[in-house]
Amino acid sequence: MDKQSLHETAKRLALELPFVELCWPFGPEFDVFKIGGKIFMLSSELRGVPFINLKSDPQKSLLNQQIYPSIKPGYHMNKKHWISVYPGEEISEALLRDLINDSWNLVVDGLAKRDQKRVRPG
């Protein structure tokens, strides 16, 4: 995925998920995506290079970092629980969708049971 499409694609995929809120609590240079008031994705740039921060299971995080050169420990985040995704040939829309969905689900899993039922009906 190239530099221009990383943010656009990630934003579109995140906003397809139920009950997602887009806000800018850290200023206009950080798109912040929340579910139930908790952050699951941040989108910004570092020295002109776009990146996406996503919550990640620690084991999956390490595996993805070994497989995909464009996935690094989370920039300015807890490196055990967050990853940063940078532009790269190996970053496909399908991979990005899986990473975003995993992040959303990890955050929802941490919500109160009543909130989980509200955002994950059925």
Swiss-Prot record:
Domain of life, per lineage: Bacteria
Q: Which Pfam families match?
A: YjbR (PF04237)
InterPro entries attached here?
A: YjbR, YjbR-like_sf
* Annotated PANTHER family: CYTOPLASMIC PROTEIN (PTHR35145:SF1), CYTOPLASMIC PROTEIN-RELATED (PTHR35145)
Entry protein name? Uncharacterized protein YbdF
